[in-house]
Amino acid sequence: DDVVIDDLLEMATKTALRQHEVTDSVMLAALKLAREMAGAGELDAFFLQNCLRQEKVNLFVASLSEMCGLDVKIIWRSMRERTGESLAIIMKSLDVDRDRFASLFLLIAQSRSGGRARATSLVKSIVSLYDDIKVKNAKVAVRHWQRDFRYQNAMSDIKDTT
């Protein structure tokens, strides 16, 4: 059916793009390790938290990318976002519990700010948002993000020629 074909084309496109675009050797090593760990069933929110605590940010990004199927560029973007909304959606799509999400959010905020404290109101706000997000809706949003801009354009070009 069309959805299966779209999914297969998307996976092939993303694999090819990922191999050509990630040139940073540290990130390549992190992606390789994340794939191996995923294959062994060792990636989870606790592991992500430990990556951040140990300041292994590239491994965190690679592992989260592997867990949710999003490109590392989208993960990096979600980490740079001050409000944390994208990160909340990604974590909710993985059904990460509230306390673990709050911890991950704070660790990311600290890594961005050099360890400075985060405003309590922002933390309360993002945790409240996290509570309001339904797992099903988060999965739909992540699925939409997985179909990145270049893939959507390629599919549009293919449909225009048929």
Regions found by a protein language model. Give the residues of each.
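Alpha-helical scaffold segments
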Residues: 1-162
